Amino acid sequence: MPKTFYLTTAIDYTNGAPHIGHAYEKILADVIARYHRLKGEEVFYLTGVDQHGQKVQQSAEKAGIAPQQFVDEITAKFIALWDKLDVRYDRWAATTDPVHKTCVQGILQRLYDEKQIYKDKQEGYYSVRQEQFLTDKERDPDGEFGPEWGQVEHRTEENYYFKLEPHKEWLLGYLRAHPDCVTPDFRQTELINADEKLSGDLCISRPKSRLSWGIELLFDSAYVTYVWFDALTNYISFVGYDPSISSFSLQPSTFQEKWPALHIIGKDILIPAHGIYWPIMLHALGFPDEQMPKFLVHGWWNISGAKMSKSLGNVIDPDSLADKYGAEALRYYLMSDIVTGKDSDFEERRLIELYNSDLANSLGNLLNRTLSMAGKYRNGQVLGPGRLNPEPGMAEGERWNLGQQLNVVSGLAVVANKEASGAGFDIHDVIGVLNHWTTQCNTLVEVAAPWKLVKDDSRASDLNAVLYCLAESLRIIAILILPALPKAAHGIFDQLNWKMEPELAGKEARFSLADAEWGKLPDGHIVGKPTPLFPRIETSPEG
């Protein structure tokens, strides 16, 4: 059976409403998942919420409600937003789910039985915000703990620890032998440097005396699981991992069909959680090297180069943006105006500019003028593919320009198809090629001047060639832009009157990368009438 392409995002902490960073990551994963489905692959996309931990418990207490009610209310906001933004996932991961709880408890019990977890006393400074003890490495040059740690207090506490150091050399060797483990590659270098400095073990418990909202340890009911150990395990708990089976090769087939995963995460949670703790946890559970996950590490959306934060009051709300401009406008901006793996500045003005220039003025205009001309000049028929009239109906230079532009446009089908076929993570590159193609199609209209060709019967073949070239370009562009703009892709197909079978309406099965080959639009195809697909976003003179 073919291997499933399994991808995950970080699960979002339910102590507050979703922000633009959450939306970017989930849309990025959604677009990557849709590209793989477009190629005919089986895809499993997992996302969800992290519902345990001290911050959740404190927020619930502040709100005067039970933790479960609090996380349920926050979770509903995330689910509603992903639905609004057309994020299509295959499984929802909530860490209060009994399936997850059972898996976490089973993993911890097994590691405890294998002496990989031990109990010890720790004394030192504790970050309430980050829910961890701090060491001198976390102090700034002045010897103080920075504001990122929030409230810091001195504590003495007994807890359970997971052994990290015995796996340090293995992880170093693995990372050096697998240079493609982390994308972009400079993040892998950072991870290796961090692993070289690794010391100490990981505290994986919290006493119930100060934190009751968590998954209880089976071997000591006075403790709950540390939120990071709990959260990381979701990547295997929701796809059928059985912690009672120590051999990976004996795991259920439903799990082995999916694993290993591609983890799509922000740069702030690669080190140490995902890049060090998680591989070591898997190694301790007996996962072989070839079954280690890969990581796509994305950057942040900033405001004027500074990180968004609640304290600065500059957090961007994706829900209100989607209401204001539409989900497709937001999806397009977030995918086109950032290089995957790097940071970018969020500007509402840029969102409007890119939508109006790339979609309303370029792609939308191309669709409108193509269908209008086909309707006006050929009663909606696309006759072709046609050829240039060999008779001297125009000046040699003019004829060469038209032929050249036709070749440019049809040739871009190969370029765009190749770009999308190999689409890994550089979504903005694919969008850039499609934008260039659309621009060249609009240039073809200006070069060919169909309104002149229709007046000369000897130029009928030229007109047919131009209209076919435009309609066929739109058909293929719709296929390739589907992952980023699913609703727009369906809209283009609808107006082209293409694949209109009722059972395909609104479904991804309507699109296939195999169909994105030049020449599949049949001679005599009847297109529909144009309706505005991308209404311009009008701004005030001051805006």
Each predicted region: which residue ranges?
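Structured secondary-structure scaffolds
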Residues: 2-40, 44-47, 99-103, 147-376, ...
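N-terminal Rossmann-like or analogous alpha/beta NTP/dinucleotide-binding catalytic cores
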Residues: 2-117
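Short secondary-structure capping/junction motifs at helix and strand boundaries
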Residues: 85-94, 112-125, 137-138, 153-155, ...
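Cys/His-rich short segments
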Residues: 114-168, 172
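Helix-loop segments that flank and shape redox-cofactor active sites
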Residues: 254-264, 418-425, 450-453
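Amphipathic alpha-helix face/heptad-repeat signature
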Residues: 355, 359-362, 366, 398, ...
